[in-house]
């Protein structure tokens, strides 16, 4: 058999593009996305000759190694080694009524946000659509789930999705496809630091997914201190694109705001944020800073987080606080940095997983 990297990635294909004739394509799609098959030999209702032909030409996995690090709160950080040796991460977050995965779209990230460990890594490369999808499929396999049991996807891991839009759109289309993962568009959230051109493009694609803007400051001066690349895209320009997205899709937009001590946590900044969002169907998601080794910033104390939230609510802005999950294994928001937690805690994968 050819080495994995020499084979073609079958996860790049929409169900109607899969190899085979007619109903054989539907069978393959069912094995991939409903049953979560990780080897063509598992597809027992396909003729043996077809299974062998598929295995000679296509690969099912984009990873050479998968490591899992469980948190005390039930979430699990996954560290994936890609076929070229580069690495990326994703997080599984089980809740009482839903199962969520946080997926990466890049190796590293070019945005360089000061509060984010991923940004400190710099940019490695874009992930392919297959590499984005396989994070979800591998997590489902490891958790003993059908891929279709994971009903919430947030593209909030490593990377800026709108700077890898071609691959992200392809992956999202497969997620939404009725013969693939069959996700509801409202269950898919794409997070961006604010790339106006990408937001307009996303609106025109009209996939109906949710948009989350990593704003982190209500004014350009403060935002440039937090996000080095913010000088390229003034807040006014970003907000114009966001308002267009809302008008086009009728989807409420989430604004993510990581609170940093003495930087963006003053109550006057809460009032300025409320003014900025006036007239827009918006929800503010306040994120307490999750510490990481070498971080140049500090988080706002809990009392300050609560006060900022109360001020926004007083001004009529729907607001919630995203308290951390997975912080003990470096899986919380802003902590993904390709680091193995200490002490090392490996969750064994089923035999053959990640191959």
UniProtKB/Swiss-Prot annotation:
- Gene behind this chain? rlmN
Protein name per the record: Probable dual-specificity RNA methyltransferase RlmN
Q: Which GO terms describe its molecular function?
A: 4 iron, 4 sulfur cluster binding; metal ion binding; rRNA (adenine(2503)-C2-)-methyltransferase activity; rRNA binding; tRNA (adenine(37)-C2)-methyltransferase activity; tRNA binding
Its GO biological process annotations read: rRNA base methylation; tRNA methylation
The leader peptide range reads none
- Which Cys pairs does UniProt list as disulfide-bonded? 102-333
Q: Which residues bind [4Fe-4S] cluster?
A: 109, 113, 116
* Binding locations of S-adenosyl-L-methionine: 159-160, 191, 214-216, 290
Q: Which organism is it from?
A: Thermus thermophilus (strain ATCC BAA-163 / DSM 7039 / HB27)
Keyword annotations of the record: 4Fe-4S, Cytoplasm, Disulfide bond, Iron, Iron-sulfur, Metal-binding, Methyltransferase, rRNA processing, S-adenosyl-L-methionine, Transferase, tRNA processing
